[in-house]
């Protein structure tokens, strides 16, 4: 096992980093990103992969040899999650269904965070049995929506104390459920700023 964890910039997709650098104007080319002055600079292939990802997502284009943000890229730069998940938000907004967008926000927030389900060693079978009540065998996305609907929608938004009780009995991490709820709220606010209609 390595003595130190590899720096995050060397082990994750650079799409979001490249997008941010382009949006604030500190980079226009892959060379600008590579030469930026990171403590642990990424290699050229990782930077190139980041640009390719943004091209596939239609977040960037080229004008007179320079990389520019598209309308989609400017929207993505304002969404505080992985660029691929952010693109899901934009596509859901384009579909024109406020309820669809609300569901997508719940799913992308779930995918952005650590799974809130807990399986303590001494109660693994009980936790699995309880979690199976939320499961949809056709889709993990629908499972996430089931958890959200039953915890945060069924009886109204629970107080912190009520959420703690739910988490204790349903084997959810209270902290991760709070993070999920907070990220959904943040994404809903961002959608309003982008003039997306959320149900």
Regions found by a protein language model. Give the residues of each.
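Second RecA-like catalytic domain
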Residues: 1-199
């Amino acid at each position: 096992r390595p003595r130190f964890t590899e720096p995050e910039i060397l082990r994750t997709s650079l799409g979001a980093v490249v997008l941010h650098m382009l949006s604030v104007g500190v980079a226009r080319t892959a060379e600008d990103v590579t030469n930026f002055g990171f403590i642990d600079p990424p290699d050229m292939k990782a930077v190139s992969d980041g640009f390719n990802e943004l091209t596939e997502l239609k977040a960037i284009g080229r004008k007179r040899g320079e990389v520019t943000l598209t309308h989609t890229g400017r929207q993505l730069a304002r969404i505080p999650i992985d660029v691929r998940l952010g693109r899901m938000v934009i596509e859901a907004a384009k579909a024109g269904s406020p309820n669809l967008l609300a569901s997508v926000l719940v799913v992308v927030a779930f995918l952005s965070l650590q799974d809130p389900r807990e399986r303590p060693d001494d109660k693994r079978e009980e936790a699995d049995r309880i979690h199976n009540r939320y499961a949809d065998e056709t889709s993990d996305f629908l499972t996430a929506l089931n958890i959200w609907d039953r915890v945060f929608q069924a009886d109204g938004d629970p107080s912190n104390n009520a959420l703690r009780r739910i988490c204790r009995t349903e084997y959810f991490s209270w902290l991760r459920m709070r993070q999920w709820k907070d990220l959904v709220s943040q994404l809903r606010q961002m959608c309003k700023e982008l003039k997306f209609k959320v149900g």
